[in-house]
């Protein structure tokens, strides 16, 4: 693989990070011709099929999350507002980002043009950032409710709404700059989906500073909030457990909480660590060659989160799962288990906290 082309000959709307045997790079524009010089047609078809799978799974799961919360009163707790917010952000990514990518991969180039690329890049980044910050808010809200660092503070609906609004404000702050000249939205990887420009340097777009901004503001800070909040939550629950008799119910609840926390943190890392690692590697290894197809993997991981985040935060919750089954099967669960978090798990304080707060319900 040849090193990337010099940054002195940059088109305004795209950049292909590899040397290409073409006298006029514009003739290979990802907005004009199939990008089969970057990968085989089979690879593009496979990516289109994967994006279609994300759409087919993500739309029903996230739509059901919203509909079930509206339909069942017991799901409309203040701590669940952020899950509806997460579902809305996921739907934005799916309906704009994944759908556009699916069509583009099927055509093997970004057939919708530069303006659509900017719209798709902005919308997908906005939805992704809102989703990312929603995971941090989920963790922090549970820290406030369970650990009670503010004493007798009561978590109200207004606080939940404020948390949701904050995610959209922070998401806009992170995703809007490329629309105004701080970095830019261009086709990435196989040139069939759009995102911030990680590839170029020493130019008018100042991409290096934008990448560092995203790394700090949209990965480091949320990750610190998540690790701190869930770490304190585990410490608090262990302290509660030590004050009680170590019954089988308490031990089971403790294991469930620990497992849920680990899954939540890993879900965040699986979603965003590849994107962050790739962007930082490109910024700090200018001139180093890399497989262009691999540059599509981080985007795939982030778009996949629209499916596995609802699985972690919604389907792993008994109350949400029970309500979804009732909705789908006309009011009765096919398994005959009217799961309710107010059952035997409330035999001890720690088990009650684990089921109704850590796994949001």
UniProtKB/Swiss-Prot annotation:
GO terms for biological process: absorption of visible light; cellular response to light stimulus; G protein-coupled receptor signaling pathway; phototransduction; visual perception. The keyword Phosphoprotein applies. PROSITE patterns: G_PROTEIN_RECEP_F1_1, G_PROTEIN_RECEP_F1_2, OPSIN. Glycans are attached at residue 24. CDD domains: 7tmA_SWS2_opsin. InterPro entries: GPCR_opsins, GPCR_Rhodpsn, GPCR_Rhodpsn_7TM, Opsin, Opsin_blue, Retinal_BS. The color pigments are found in the cone photoreceptor cells. The keyword Membrane applies. Keywords: Chromophore, Disulfide bond, G-protein coupled receptor, Glycoprotein, Membrane, Phosphoprotein, Photoreceptor protein, Receptor, Retinal protein, Sensory transduction, Transducer, Transmembrane, Transmembrane helix, Vision. The modification N6-(retinylidene)lysine is found at residue 303. One of its GO terms (molecular function) is G protein-coupled photoreceptor activity. Disulfide bonds join 117-194. It is a multi-pass membrane protein. Residues 69-80, 141-159, 238-259, 317-361 are cytoplasmic. Phosphorylated on some or all of the serine and threonine residues present in the C-terminal region. It holds the Pfam family 7tm_1. One of its GO terms (cellular component) is photoreceptor outer segment. Belongs to the G-protein coupled receptor 1 family. Opsin subfamily. Visual pigments are the light-absorbing molecules that mediate vision. They consist of an apoprotein, opsin, covalently linked to cis-retinal. PANTHER family: OPSIN. This is Blue-sensitive opsin. It comes from Gallus gallus.
